[in-house]
């Protein structure tokens, strides 16, 4: 590659051209000024980035030594806590101080609801997520197991199933927006009279809403509106009325659908759900982000023999009760997740020819792209408060948060953005951040817009941090351990006392089974009940259904109750290490190995061979689960731990990998791009899976990215060589990195 030199940086041509020809257009930023600013950031902050990574390694070595020394003595939580304090792992908790974050959008500070995470490498999925602000409740109930399917249901539209859906939707309306008299199922017609909702029942009586303030607006003629807009707990409900519609003509009041606010916010992901290993991949990520920031992104595709084009939805316009115009945001508020401090990219090399910290590049380009939105260039405005929300993952403690804040300040200065334009979302997914969360938040007190728990990454770090303490319990038992409950409560407790409500989100993790919506409806209500203002969902449909929970729970009221009750989580529980003192029967050990190996292979083979960073992967029981690098981290670290402590042998794990490869091959038999791993077991993907376990203990903090990146680059080079040998044009990856939802 003939790199382009700019201010001491050596830049991949594809990235250089993107900045000059696309990213800087209509921003007022000259490409040369951008590279000069980035060069200064790399020069000044690059060494600090590397030093903080060295601190991680030094602390891990000290902890490993402590566990080796105390291996044959009963675990002493007091001695352990004192040790963590002595080495600087556990820092003094600062006095409580309210955050000062300003200029946040209502989706961050006021509205509680679901949050999507979508890979930025796939334009169509990113557009679907951005447009998932509003979702059809009828479709979500009809098309999933939220309502159990009966034997003999008709193909296409089944009237009996449709009746159940409509009954469920009307029961929801009765719960969220009850009438003063009667039920929504009894309504013969909706109209607007003197700025109030007038409801005619089938018996001829007239009523209204029990709480008249829940009427927010309408579309069409006041006497025969085409839509009625209601609101509950800050979330809007759009009752679509069309008596000529195939659904509406069969039911009272002509209700054709109930559209509800669903994905209030969406994280555009540059990190765990993408496989971006080189400059070409990074430019794909950045180009899609640009299209979302300036409102021009489209995606054209074939479906059922038709050519369809997706674009960002417009805002929704209603007549307000007072006769004025009410405009509601038509799209999910977009946040961007950059990579962590531990990642480096060859898209740009420094003066020494070394890869630069990838997070520096992500922050600089994210800030540049946001100018298209902040300065009003965008056709579809994202932030109306003039902020950019950057989620920063995998930070270890307040010093690393401080580095991110300084980086954001430098980006603002180089781009001429208002101070504190760049907000920080703190992923509470590493153990040292958890135990020092109060200090982390205060370090970013003028920028923090989000804290979030992530069970899987957090468990991966739990295992790696205490690798020398002993064999860990079985993976499925982790959610019952004292540390995990303390972790979830600790995050909310600290978020409340630090004053996040009204200024920042308090988030919870992903529902990983996109086909099990009945289970999600039964279980994920726990997140708003826990005081979380948002929680992750795997699809737009899941967002629509999870939104129902925020109508059931008044999160702001629940937060006040929790805050009044005082802090619940204890540090001693948080530091309780999930080691096992059991001897498992051989069949349990085999089951654990097989489950882990199958999950690792099912995810890694798509990552390496096809560049798919997040997808629905069938587990060993053929249940589709959303997999990304977080799920891979826990599985690989768990097996590495059991190997290290002699619970399993190298031969047992390798035997399982080979048996599971056959199963994974069978599960992917319908994919024309899939490359089988059996019977040779010598593919790059199979080797990568083995590396993740057999080299797992030596990976910094148990991260999987370094091995995946190394092996994906190898696979891409092999594919390029094969195309060159056959005389084919080099078209890159056979498939965009995509979430199969």
Curated annotation (Swiss-Prot):
One example of a Gene Ontology biological process annotation: tricarboxylic acid cycle
Keywords: Cytoplasm, Glyoxylate bypass, Magnesium, Metal-binding, Oxidation, Transferase, Tricarboxylic acid cycle
Cofactor: Mg(2+)
Enzyme class: transferase
Pathway: Carbohydrate metabolism; glyoxylate cycle; (S)-malate from isocitrate: step 2/2
Family under the similarity heading: Belongs to the malate synthase family. GlcB subfamily.
Protein name: Malate synthase G
Gene this chain is encoded by: glcB
């Amino acid at each position: 590659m003939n790199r382009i030199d700019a201010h001491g940086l050596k830049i991949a041509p594809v990235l250089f051209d993107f900045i000059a020809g696309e990213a800087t257009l209509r921003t007022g930023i000259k490409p040369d000024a951008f590279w000069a600013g980035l060069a200064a950031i790399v020069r000044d902050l690059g060494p600090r980035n590397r030093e903080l990574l060295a601190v991680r390694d030094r602390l891990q070595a000290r902890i490993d030594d402590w566990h080796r020394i105390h291996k044959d003595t009963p675990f002493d939580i007091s001695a352990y806590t004192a040790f963590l304090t002595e080495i600087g792992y556990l820092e003094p908790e600062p006095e409580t101080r309210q955050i000062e974050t300003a200029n946040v959008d209502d989706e961050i500070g006021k509205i509680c609801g679901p949050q999507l995470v979508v890979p930025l490498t796939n334009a169509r999925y990113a557009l679907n997520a951005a447009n998932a602000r509003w979702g059809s409740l009828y479709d979500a109930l009809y098309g999933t197991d939220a309502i159990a399917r009966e034997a003999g249901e008709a193909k296409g539209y089944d009237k009996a199933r449709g009746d159940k859906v409509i009954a469920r939707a009307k029961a929801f309306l009765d719960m969220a927006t009850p009438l003063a008299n009667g039920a929504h199922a009894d309504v013969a017609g909706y109209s607007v009279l003197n700025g109030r909702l007038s409801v005619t029942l089938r018996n001829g009586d007239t009523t209204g809403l029990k709480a008249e303030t829940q009427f927010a607006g309408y579309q069409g003629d006041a006497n025969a509106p085409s839509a009625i807009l209601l609101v509950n707990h800050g979330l809007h409900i759009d009752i679509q009325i069309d008596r000529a519609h195939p659904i509406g003509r069969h039911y009272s009041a002509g209700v054709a659908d109930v559209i509800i606010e669903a994905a209030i916010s969406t994280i555009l992901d540059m990190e765990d759900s993408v496989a971006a290993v080189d400059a070409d991949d990074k430019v794909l990520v950045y180009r899609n982000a640009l299209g979302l920031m300036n409102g021009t992104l489209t995606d054209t595709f074939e479906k059922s023999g038709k050519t369809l084009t997706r674009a960002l939805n417009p805002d929704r316009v209603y007549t307000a009760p007072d006769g004025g115009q009410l405009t509601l945001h038509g799209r999910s508020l977009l946040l961007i997740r950059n990579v962590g401090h531990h990642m480096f990219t060859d898209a740009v090399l420094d003066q020494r020819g070394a890869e630069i910290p990838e997070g520096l590049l992500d922050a600089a380009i994210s800030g540049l792209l946001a100018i298209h939105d902040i300065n009003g260039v965008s056709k579809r405005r994202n932030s109306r408060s003039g902020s950019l929300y950057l989620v920063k993952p995998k930070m270890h403690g307040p010093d690393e948060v401080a580095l991110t804040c300084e980086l954001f300040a430098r980006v603002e200065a180089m781009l001429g953005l208002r101070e504190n334009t760049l907000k920080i979302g703190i992923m509470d997914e590493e153990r040292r951040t958890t135990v020092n969360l109060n200090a982390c938040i205060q370090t970013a007190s003028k920028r923090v817009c989000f804290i979030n728990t992530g069970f899987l990454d957090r468990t991966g770090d739990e295992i790696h941090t205490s690798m020398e303490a002993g064999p860990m319990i079985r993976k499925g038992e982790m959610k019952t351990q004292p540390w995990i409950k303390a972790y979830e409560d600790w995050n909310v407790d600290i978020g409340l006392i630090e004053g996040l409500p009204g200024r920042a989100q308090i988030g919870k993790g992903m529902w990983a089974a996109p086909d099990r919506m009945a289970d999600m409806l039964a279980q994920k209500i726990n997140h708003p009940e826990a005081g979380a203002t948002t929680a992750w969902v795997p699809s737009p449909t899941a967002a629509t259904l999870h939104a129902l929970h925020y109508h059931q729970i008044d999160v702001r009221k629940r937060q006040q109750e929790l805050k009044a009750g005082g802090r619940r989580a204890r540090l001693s529980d948080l530091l309780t290490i999930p080691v096992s003192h059991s001897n498992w029967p051989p069949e349990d050990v085999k089951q654990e190995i097989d489950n882990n190996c199958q999950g690792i292979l099912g995810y890694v083979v798509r990552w390496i061979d096809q560049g798919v960073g997040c997808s629905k992967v069938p587990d060993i029981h053929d249940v589709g689960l959303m997999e990304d690098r977080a799920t891979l981290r826990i599985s690989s670290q768990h097996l590495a731990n059991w190997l290290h402590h002699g619970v399993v042998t190298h031969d047992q794990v390798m035997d399982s990998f080979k048996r599971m490869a056959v199963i994974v091959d069978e599960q992917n038999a319908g994919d024309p791009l899939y490359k089988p791993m059996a019977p040779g077991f010598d593919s790059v993907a199979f080797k990568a899976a083995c590396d993740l376990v057999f080299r797992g203990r030596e990976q910094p903090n148990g991260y999987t990215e370094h091995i995946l990146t190394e092996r994906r680059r190898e696979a891409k080079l092999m594919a390029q060589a094969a195309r060159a040998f056959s005389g084919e044009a080099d078209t890159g990856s056979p498939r965009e990195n995509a979430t199969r939802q």
